[in-house]
Design a protein with these regions (language model features):
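Membrane-interface alpha helices of multi-pass inner-membrane proteins
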Residues: 159-177
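Membrane-interface micro-motifs in multi-pass membrane enzymes
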Residues: 55, 103-148, 174
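Transmembrane signal-anchor helices characteristic of membrane glycosylation enzymes that use polyprenol
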Residues: 4-30
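Short hydrophobic/aromatic helix or loop-helix immediately within or flanking a transmembrane segment
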Residues: 48-79
Length: 177
């Protein structure tokens, strides 16, 4: 019999592989070119924040990924972000019920997200779109999960640091917060 941790590792691998395989064949488009050429200095980020989008977290993520990584690497990082978001969704109910996360719930949530998201490509594979929606929702999912862990009594220094960092990233992300 395969134990739950191995099943969860397989579920994580399946989600990551499916997302990466689609992202692998998705070309750069639209704002990806503009954000790849943006200046990534404090003054450049501030000017863009005040004059254009107001999304400091997502704009910095998209510019950093496009500027410093090859398409295959930023696609892998982006696939990991979606996988982490879905993993957080699967762990949240387990933490609330003090049970083990289910790999079947993770796979179900991934396919539900895939089917129910009418703009799946724009919010997950187009890199600037994923920075605006996927990454920011990932930070929100991490914040919710860490909040539950802290409220359940896990107040280690690392947990409190992640709690503060995730609250800032989630709070400064976009209109979802």
């Amino acid at each position: 019999m395969i134990n739950n941790r191995l099943k969860m590792a397989i579920a994580i691998f399946i989600v990551f592989s499916l997302v990466y395989s689609i992202g692998f064949i998705t070309p750069m488009n639209s704002d990806d070119y503009t954000y790849a050429l943006r200046e990534l200095s404090f003054s450049g980020v501030k000017m863009h924040y005040l004059g254009w989008s107001g999304r400091i977290v997502s704009d910095t993520i998209s510019t950093s990924l496009l500027k410093f990584f090859s398409p295959h690497i930023y696609n892998a990082i982006n696939s990991a972000a979606l996988t982490l978001m879905v993993l957080c969704w699967a762990i949240i109910p387990a933490k609330l019920t003090r049970s083990s996360p289910s790999p079947y719930v993770m796979i179900f949530l991934f396919f539900l997200y895939f089917i129910a998201n009418p703009a799946f490509g724009q919010t997950n594979f187009w890199l600037v779109g994923s920075a605006n929606y996927l990454w920011t929702n990932m930070f929100i999912a991490i914040y919710i999960l860490i909040s539950i862990c802290v409220s359940n009594g896990n107040r280690s220094n690392l947990m409190l640091f992640v709690y503060v960092a995730s609250s800032i990233l989630a709070g400064c992300s976009n209109e979802n917060t």
